[in-house]
Amino acid sequence: MCIRDSDRVKAVADACRQRGIPIRIGVNSGSLEKEILAKYGHPTPEALCDSALYHASLLEKFDFNDIVLSMKSSTVSTMIKAYELAAERCDYPLHLGVTEAGTERMGIIKSSAGIGALLLHGIGDTIRVSLTADPVKEVYAAHDILKALDIEKDGVQFVSCPTCGRTRIDLVKIANEVEDKLRNCKKNIKVAVMGCVVNGPGEAREADIGIAGGDGCGLVFKKGEILRKVPEDKLVDALLEEVEKL
């Protein structure tokens, strides 16, 4: 909702101040003012940043500074640059996100690229992953981005290798099953699912616990040290048992 009338802006600012509620100013390519569009020609990063700071100035006139800025674009490079400009020009908290990112597959890729690039440079305070998918998957994706960047410590860091000629187990099925069953595990651990015993324990020696496939069987290892050998159909259960012990 866009409120520009001075009296209405003051009323909103006063009400939020009395209740200790921050105001998030959300800008996207479809919300830009005609004057700003005329100046830049199209929704550039500069246009998004100018619009957000303009709306912030409307609140600042009434001494309201409990503000969060959001400048979302469906183009990752535009979104990144807009937030970089805002970080240079103000000290307000920034809410990161790629708007209209798309379906689960492409949306996660675009959100990870945009949000991740900014967080790696210390830009951003809150995030939102927008997907044309089950909203629960948006939450999972957001947590996964934070875990991948070592910002969030709660939950499993899951690693698995691509299949190769040495793989003799159904690695894809096993990896998906393990990831799904550990999705809500809150332990700060790294779990590995590797395709072969030749490289598995060595490549994933930093994992707290892991499995490596053989021919109809596999090894369970901990910090690169082999614990035991189990049949392929028992690999997942054996791994989960070891996770419970950690």
Regions found by a protein language model. Give the residues of each.
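Hydrophobic alpha-helical bundle architecture
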Residues: 174-201, 205
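Conserved small/polar residues in nucleotide/adenosyl-binding loops
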Residues: 1-5
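Catalytic alpha/beta core domains of metabolic enzymes, predominantly
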Residues: 28, 36-183
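Beta-strand/loop-dominated core regions that host nucleotide or nucleotide-derived cofactor-binding catalytic loops
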Residues: 215-221, 225-246
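Conserved, mostly hydrophobic/aromatic
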Residues: 25, 69, 118, 161, ...
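Short amphipathic alpha-helices and their capping/turn segments at secondary-structure boundaries
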Residues: 6-23
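Nucleotide-binding motor/catalytic cores of P-loop/tubulin-like NTPases across gene-expression machines
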Residues: 197-226
